[in-house]
A protein has these predicted regions:
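Edge beta-strand at a domain terminus
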Residues: 35-41, 54, 88-98, 128-155, ...
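C-terminal tail/sorting-segment detector
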Residues: 19, 454, 486-502
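Extended, low-complexity, turn-rich repeat/linker tracts enriched in Gly/Pro/Ser/Thr and Asp/Glu
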Residues: 78-80, 278-288, 300-303
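Aromatic (Trp/Tyr/Phe) and Gly/Pro-enriched flexible surface segments
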Residues: 148-269, 273, 287-298, 303-378
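Terminal processing/anchoring signals of secreted or surface-associated proteins
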Residues: 72, 274, 456-459, 475, ...
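Bacterial Sec-dependent N-terminal signal peptides
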Residues: 1-39, 475
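Residue-level detector of functionally pivotal "anchor" positions at catalytic/ligand-binding pockets or at interdomain
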Residues: 378-385, 453-477
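Beta-rich interaction/scaffold domains
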Residues: 378-456
Length: 502
């Protein structure tokens, strides 16, 4: 929680924080001509707690020297019930081409009067009409994180906000069910609970409850279900596929908050994590498990369970059909995504949580608590090679190398990554290769610099500058032979000779 214990500086020094951000704006410099403006969701967190979640605009402008500037317009955050207006923050950034997209990166210490150097770390992706950006500011022991753009996490996946229907915002249960039997199925099946998971910084989770439904002369168990799509009650037979959760980006229906019955997704996550606490009201040996499912699709109609005989356009799925009774304890689950069709571009995700993995099974008093659901994007590099030659002694956290090879281009560089959708941008200029590697959600990145030495047999010509060049036996150019060893000297006529420095 963001309270007195961990927010002494941020809350007690309100004016200091205002001065910090205001001075930051001035220190980064003012730029007036902007090429493109993006509007989207801006989320600001301090030490893990969300302080602001609103619509904002960011401008991106190309400068005369080829660099870019990101301008966060009219930046403000909510602090202790007050709106803190910061102004416009401008961040110069270096561009890296990435297919039809562009990555923008900055990592610099900003000197601010009376505050010293404040580190700012930026990584953004500009693709078509969308911008996604991560900005990290470390100030006085606080981690301030600014995320712009959606499409990489499920909104309200920490279950902190609930609407008038009692459903968590951007999630839907039987309160908003549709279909032939909607009137019989409607109930408060998913509600807020204060039983948060251990270590949570939030105040609530979601409680999903099953119940019995009476149909004339018989009754059925209605599994408690929550989804990012919408529930359809189309049959009195529980196992019928007409009873489902579904999404369709073409569907124009809105819930009571004005939100659609779907969640858009642009990312390629590696796993789904969530905290659960599950209790069967009446133990069932044949049907003991709750379930959690997430399916990434191209945004066309999709439902769970799938209707037999129909083909759906799905890219990946993460499924756990064996969530056992946790005996009153919280348990963290990590469910890997299985990519079934990588050729499909991600457009939407359908997450469905239910008190039983089998339709109509379990009891009418089962309870599934869920907290802090998250899409995880792996980050890591296993190796880098140039023209098929692996970098010698490669270590993931070592970022500078020298590699002897003939003339190389960016296409000659291969990077083996650990994440499903990791981003790799490469440039080669003036004998130096730069490789920018990032997680698919931009939350982590690393820059590798490789001095691409040509070797003794491939020394570059110096006819243009008429100067003598000095190389080590490894092919690395140096300013002078000031240490013991063997050097290769190349004169203005292109002639070379070996020199031994004693």
């Amino acid at each position: 929680m963001f309270n007195k214990a961990n927010s002494i500086t941020f809350v007690a020094n309100y004016n200091s924080m205002k001065r910090f951000f205001t001075t930051l704006f001035v220190a980064l410099g003012a730029f007036t001509a902007f090429a493109k403006s993006y509007t989207g969701r801006l989320v600001v967190t301090v030490n893990g707690e969300t302080l602001s979640n609103k619509t904002a605009s960011i401008d991106v402008d190309q400068q005369g020297d080829g660099s870019y500037t990101l301008s966060l317009k009219n930046f403000s955050i909510s602090l202790s019930g007050q709106e803190l207006n910061i102004g416009t923050i401008n961040i110069p950034a270096t561009p890296y081409a990435l297919g039809n997209a562009r990555l923008l990166q900055a990592n610099r210490n900003v000197p601010i009067s009376s505050l010293g150097n404040v580190p700012i770390n930026l990584l953004a992706q500009e693709s078509g009409d969308k911008l996604h950006a991560n900005i990290d500011i470390n100030f006085n022991g606080m981690t301030i994180k600014v995320v712009f753009g959606e499409g990489y996490q499920v909104p309200n996946s920490n279950f902190e906000t609930f609407g008038e229907s009692k459903e968590p915002n951007r999630w839907h249960s039987f309160q908003s069910v549709t279909g032939r039997f909607a009137s019989s199925a409607q109930t408060d099946a998913a509600i807020s609970s204060d039983q948060t998971r251990p270590g949570s910084t939030g105040k609530s989770c979601v409680l999903i409850k099953s119940r019995e439904l009476d149909f004339f002369f018989f009754s059925v168990i209605a599994n408690g279900t929550l989804t990012t799509g919408r529930l359809n009650a189309g049959s009195s037979t529980a196992s019928n596929a007409k009873n489902n959760s579904f999404l369709d980006l073409a569907n124009k229906d809105k819930d009571g908050n004005g939100d659609p019955f779907y969640t858009e997704l642009s990312g390629r996550p590696d796993s789904l994590t969530l905290w659960v606490k599950f209790k069967q009201g009446k133990p069932s040996a044949d049907h003991p498990y709750a379930t959690a499912k997430a399916v990434i699709t191209d945004g066309t109609y999709y439902q769970l369970p799938e209707e037999k005989g129909k083909t759906y356009k799905k890219m990946a799925e993460a499924i756990n059909n064996e969530i056992a009774d946790t005996k009153g304890e919280w348990k963290r689950l990590s469910i890997p995504f299985n990519y079934v069709n990588n050729s499909i571009a991600p457009k939407a995700i359908l997450v469905t949580l239910s008190t039983n993995a089998d339709a109509g099974k379990g009891s009418g008093s089962d309870e599934l608590y869920v907290d802090d659901l998250e899409l995880v994007y792996n980050f890591g590099v296993e190796g880098i090679s140039i023209k098929g030659q692996a970098l010698a002694n490669f270590a993931e956290n070592t970022t500078e190398y020298t590699h002897i090879v003939g003339n190389a281009t960016a296409d000659d560089i291969m990077v083996k990554t650990k994440g499903q959708g990791m981003l790799v941008a490469k440039t080669v200029e003036n004998g130096k290769a730069t490789v920018l590697v990032a997680s698919n959600d931009l939350s982590k990145y690393r820059l590798y610099t490789i001095n691409v030495a040509t070797g003794i047999d491939n020394l570059p010509s110096v006819e243009a500058n008429k100067q003598v060049e000095i190389y080590t036996l490894d092919g690395v150019r140096v300013n002078k032979a000031d240490r013991k060893g063997v050097y290769i000297i190349k004169d203005a006529q292109g002639k070379t000779r070996k020199v031994v420095k004693q």
